[in-house]
Amino acid sequence: MPRTLTDPTADRAAAFATDAAADGLTVSLIGSCVATLTGRSQRDLAAGVRTLLWKPDDTVVVHGASGRDPDAWASGGPVTVDAADGLTVACDGGHTAGALRVRFDAVHTATAFDAAGADATTVSGTEAALKDRVLDTPDLVEPGFQPLATERDTPAGPIDIYGRDADGTVTAVELKNVRAGPAAASQLQRYVAALRRTLHADATVRGILVAPAVTAKTRRLLADRGLTFSPVSPPGSRDR
């Protein structure tokens, strides 16, 4: 079934979108926004209510209230999501003539769905099975890891598993039942930053991405941000 948020904050919408994209879902954002398309020339879209679609191949399409053709689109480049000044979605347009930047003043609805027609219940169940496996055998994450809570709420969204490592350090664990991409690393970083703000400024917080595998780019991002990858697969897989 589709995932949906109504009137989310920028932080909530950013967390929702990056998490859904990391799961290979199509993301739809409806809200009041402005957009800029740059390339051979610059084109600005004035404030208005529009629909943004972020597809699994990192194509971003923006539709207005009327007409068949999109108001703007970009594809081929990495998509970045930021909530520092409202929700901003940007695509550098690696395979197109222009880069697209969309900034939402308000998001009315955020939806994520499997446009390919895969059974979303099966995906969710597989992730739940991976979570159960980690909770049953926490040492799969790393020796000495102790889970304390699941779906712990933060300003960046709920953390899959909240716990402490062998040294007692607060640890956020992000679970992916398939090979994780850069969006998963970005989401994990959001959780870590949110926990640091919630606890205290000098708190030490770790982040561990648990998935069967990660892309090369994701591995680099994790290393650059001081995050950890732990290879764990859902039950029934031939992998660890």
From Swiss-Prot:
Protein name according to UniProt: Endonuclease NucS 1
CDD domains on file: NucS-like
Pfam families the UniProt entry points to: NucS_C, NucS_N
Keyword entries, A-Z: Cytoplasm, DNA-binding, Endonuclease, Hydrolase, Nuclease
Family: Belongs to the NucS endonuclease family.
Family matches, as HAMAP family: NucS (MF_00722)
Biological role: Cleaves both 3' and 5' ssDNA extremities of branched DNA structures.
This protein's GO CC annotations: cytoplasm
Location(s) in or outside the cell: Cytoplasm
EC number(s) given by UniProt: 3.1.-.-
Family annotation (InterPro entries): Endonuclease_NucS (IPR002793), NucS_C (IPR048301), NucS_N (IPR048302), NucS_N_sf (IPR049173), TonB_box_CS (IPR010916), tRNA_endonuc-like_dom_sf (IPR011856)
Gene Ontology molecular function: DNA binding; single-stranded DNA endodeoxyribonuclease activity
